[in-house]
Amino acid sequence: MLQNPIHLRLERLESWQHVTFMACLCERMYPNYAMFCQQTGFGDGQIYRRILDLIWETLTVKDAKVNFDSQLEKFEEAIPSADDFDLYGVYPAIDACVALSELVHSRLSGETLEHAVEVSKTSITTVAMLEMTQAGREMSDEELKENPAVEQEWDIQWEIFRLLAECEERDIELIKGLRADLREAGESNIGIIFQQ
């Protein structure tokens, strides 16, 4: 869908920066999943929270050991199917799950760049799809590029990227700060507020 120069720039970052970037974007998609679970009684919003917290832990705690295979197994059962629900919220919830799955797979494979690009694209797709749904029509990539909500999402992704790119080495305080700021904001990439 939407390409952005950020996808090329991500190549310059190290693995821990990719993982932090993905964790930040998942943190911004978490309210979409948590709200969906709350509204429908489906799944368990806490499983997403727990897995994401474990990812943050691996970034900030030296030698943190996590069995991501078993986490992924548990998580796969908590992913909704669009066919089972007749409400729009299922789509942003699925996108949030796709993003977290990409992040967990990056921890299993050790390959982080391609997963970081996918998480970036997934988050922007959530925003673009909502904008098109609200407008009641498809939009061209050109139109979407100029859409304020899409522009805002790219701006936030660039801001996270820039903060990480400025680091010479893993900065635990920056990682903790990003996590705290995003959790405190409690607002998703499409404006869903979910206080935890």
Curated annotation (Swiss-Prot):
InterPro entries: DUF416, YP001051499.1-like_dom_sf
Any Gene Ontology CC annotation: cytosol
Family from the record: To H.influenzae HI_0431.
Domain of life the protein comes from: Bacteria
Gene3D superfamilies named among the record's database cross-references: YP_001051499.1 domain like (1.20.1590.10)
Lineage: Bacteria, Pseudomonadati, Pseudomonadota, Gammaproteobacteria, Enterobacterales
Entry-linked Pfam families: DUF416
Name of this chain's protein: Uncharacterized protein YjaG
